[in-house]
Amino acid sequence: MPETYWGKAREFLSKHNLDVGDIIELEKNGIQVKGIIMPTYSNNDDIIVLKLDNGYNIGISVSNIQNVKLIEKKRKEEKRREGAVSTTNSEVMIISTGGTIVSKIEYETGAVRPALTPDEIIEFMPEIKEIARIDAEILFSILSENMKPEYWIKIAEEAKKALDKGNKGVVIAHGTDTMAYTSAALSFSFRKMTGPIVLVGSQRSSDRPSSDSSMNLLTSILVAKNAPFGEVVVNMHGESSDTYTLVHRGVKVRKMHTSRRDAFQSINDLPLAKVHYIDKKIEILSDNYRSKESENTLDAKFDNRVFLLKYYPGLSPDMVEHLISSGIRGIIIEGTGLGHTSSDFYEVFKKASKDGVFIGMTSQCLFGRVNMNVYTTGRLLQEAGVVPLEDMLPETALVKLMWTLAHENDLDRIKEIMLTNLAGEINYIHHYEMFPRWYHDRIRLQ
């Protein structure tokens, strides 16, 4: 049964006894098309997806198809177990949580699945053998938008097990959309680490010529084995070409583009390292990193009764009051500029603070730090109990608050922890180089 299809497309495939992985030939509008039926993620219920011989996928409406012929039924997939694949004396453990970074497309069956075994990963990228002995595990296979705090805990526990077994580092394959949330969660959860935990993803799927999968994975393994720091980091393309990746601190990184391969950038911080793909060398860019420890200490728990509030002109205090009455324990505000909302929120925030709700302020600008002492509105909001959170990214502040609330109930103690630099999330000194200047009069658009 074509499980990924629905509506008219599903009816068409069922009528002709076709399934994902079958090779078919069909005729429409006098044109014959041959290909493998692939899974679909389209919202259109009358489209089927075929993988052509040239490797490209096309979508075809099932309406008015004149003829369809089965060329070959799909080949049965070999049964594969999920879980750890035992490799003695591994140096780097690869933990897959989803995404396309280590996915393998089986054109014989139309299936897309994670590359499970170390042998498959090495087949995917033989150069790995020259870098490290690896082990691999599928923890779960989910889209990153479906990531949850309880999954962060499982990832942290598996990463600790891998480090405790003697691996020099851990690579976590993760979808890119929520990778920064997970990297922040792991950063706060690990108090001590014997080696790096490297989150890596892919902006382009592994079946595309422009895929960044291979380079990102290989350089991440290099970082996990050889980097001198004991931190949670994100390693992704540093530019649009295939020359180097950048290693970002897990609490100071953000996805800043929807599709570019170099979408991830350090915000209010410099990358920790630059990894040269051709030379397979790590260039340390900052000595301000957490050193490796002799043991791994994990404290992973989160309270998700929080809310990330983006202020905008016209936001009603009544809406925020209703939100607070829902039982949340904390709010992170993305305020304007130096950290502002309308002064109309003074009474709402004051009451919430008295009721024990933590309210922290970050900036929509992302770059720079909040300073609520400059203007009257900022000073009033502080009087109401709003806490300025330095140069923390909104998403990082949200995850930190979830971690803090799981450990403390006293509001004063919560404020104290939120203003304590636990994992490098607060940078007290900003340099000129930390702000990217995207335009220097060098490009003239025609």
Curated annotation (Swiss-Prot):
CDD domains: GatD. Keywords: ATP-binding, Ligase, Nucleotide-binding, Protein biosynthesis. The keyword Protein biosynthesis applies. HAMAP family: GatD. Belongs to the asparaginase 1 family. GatD subfamily. Allows the formation of correctly charged Gln-tRNA(Gln) through the transamidation of misacylated Glu-tRNA(Gln) in organisms which lack glutaminyl-tRNA synthetase. The reaction takes place in the presence of glutamine and ATP through an activated gamma-phospho-Glu-tRNA(Gln). The GatDE system is specific for glutamate and does not act on aspartate. Residues 90-421 form the Asparaginase/glutaminase domain. Pfam families: Asparaginase, Asparaginase_C, GatD_N. It catalyses: L-glutamyl-tRNA(Gln) + L-glutamine + ATP + H2O = L-glutaminyl-tRNA(Gln) + L-glutamate + ADP + phosphate + H(+). Heterodimer of GatD and GatE. It comes from Sulfolobus acidocaldarius (strain ATCC 33909 / DSM 639 / JCM 8929 / NBRC 15157 / NCIMB 11770). It is an enzyme of class 6 (ligase). GO terms for molecular function: asparaginase activity; ATP binding; glutaminyl-tRNA synthase (glutamine-hydrolyzing) activity. The active site is at T100, T176, D177, K255. This is Glutamyl-tRNA(Gln) amidotransferase subunit D. SMART domains: Asparaginase. One of its GO terms (biological process) is translation. Its EC number is 6.3.5.-. PANTHER family: 60 KDA LYSOPHOSPHOLIPASE (PTHR11707:SF28), L-ASPARAGINASE (PTHR11707).
